[in-house]
Amino acid sequence: MAVSDLLNRRVRAVPDEDEEVYSEASASESESNDEEVEGSGSDISVDSSEGDYGSESQDESDAMSNENEVEDDEDDENSDDGQDDVQASLSNISFGALAKAQASLGPKAKRKSKATESTTDDGETPAASPLDDIRARIREAREQKRQGSSKSKDLEKPSRSSKHAPMVQSSKHPVTRKRTIIEPPAALKSRDPRFDPAVRSQSGRSEASQSAYAFLDDYRAAELKEMKEKLAKTKDPRQKEALKRDIRSATDRLRTIENRRREKEVLAEHKKREKELIRDGKKSNPYFLKKSDLKKQVLLKKYESMGSRQRVKALERRQKKLTAKERKEMPMERRGLGNDSTPYNDGGGGKRRRLA
């Protein structure tokens, strides 16, 4: 209990009273052992005086051996008593005191280095008790604490507990006098309608995007008109070819957009008509247009929107297109590409002849 009290108080390792008690006990034990040895020596001397010379020498040797055994027994008893006292005192130490002592000692590497330094300086490893080690470690911890408190805190840089923790900054750091009164405008970013949330927000409907970007059709028409005017004014053949190519691609694009718009109008009218029939009870199931029927209705709507002259020209172009398609599907014998006597075969080298 003495050692635990001292560790908890953090003043001393062992009080002076216990040391005096231990010293008195050891002294009394040594005196009693000396008296026993003296008594045994007197007995041996009496017995040896009565015998002859040979017996005297044997008795003397026996006495010396007995004295050595007694001394060894005394040393063993003293060491056992000391170890028992230390173990009893250590068993009464509280866990809190042990934890404080261990925290104040520092890492094991420092302990080992200090132990090696002590052994190298002395040249011999003295058999120190665990209490002496605890006392030395407590002294070292106090010295380290005293040295750490003496250092100035300004030299220590603020460090974070981990890399994810926020940065620590002193409150004495002066604040800058510069203030942002007016924030500069943000840099303009290009907007792509394919990925614009304003366009894609309405559940992916293309009608919203078309209505929002309907002005692009006007731009395309104006661009096509401008290219046609340039083509009429230019005389460079290369520039003319480039303008013709651009005009052709622009007209194809406008034609495709117009055809898609007609298809959507035809589908919307058909769905509306079918819904009205179902509502009136004339139909139970709606009729869905096939691609061929949709194509016919779109073509009919296209011709209805044209004028008389445009309609005639469009029909003539369509007729030429159909005849060319039929001629391609016709076999080679019926196309008039060779004489009847020399029929056309894959291995022959006859030339093709155009029909007038």
From Swiss-Prot:
Q: How does it assemble?
A: Associates with 90S and pre-40S pre-ribosomal particles.
Q: Where is the signal peptide?
A: none
Q: Which organism is it from?
A: Neosartorya fischeri (strain ATCC 1020 / DSM 3700 / CBS 544.65 / FGSC A1164 / JCM 1740 / NRRL 181 / WB 181)
What functional role does this protein have? Component of the 90S pre-ribosome involved in the maturation of rRNAs. Required for early cleavages of the pre-RNAs in the 40S ribosomal subunit maturation pathway.
A GO cellular-component term linked to this record: 90S preribosome
Write out the GO biological process terms.
maturation of SSU-rRNA from tricistronic rRNA transcript (SSU-rRNA, 5.8S rRNA, LSU-rRNA)
UniProt lists the gene as rrp36
Family according to the record = Belongs to the RRP36 family.
Record flagged with keyword rRNA processing: yes
Superkingdom:
Eukaryota
- InterPro entries per UniProt: RRP36 (IPR009292)
Keyword tRNA processing among record annotations:
no
Q: What stretch or stretches form a coiled coil here?
A: 238-279
**Record's compositionally biased regions (Basic and acidic residues):** 132-159, 313-337
Composition bias (Acidic residues) maps to 57-84
For this entry, the protein name equals rRNA biogenesis protein rrp36
Biased amino acid composition, Polar residues: 200-209
Stretch list, region Disordered: 1-209, 307-356
Task: Name the keywords, alphabetized.
Answer: Coiled coil, Nucleus, Ribonucleoprotein, Ribosome biogenesis, rRNA processing
Source taxonomy lineage? Eukaryota, Fungi, Dikarya, Ascomycota, Pezizomycotina
Task: Give its localization.
Answer: Nucleus, Nucleolus
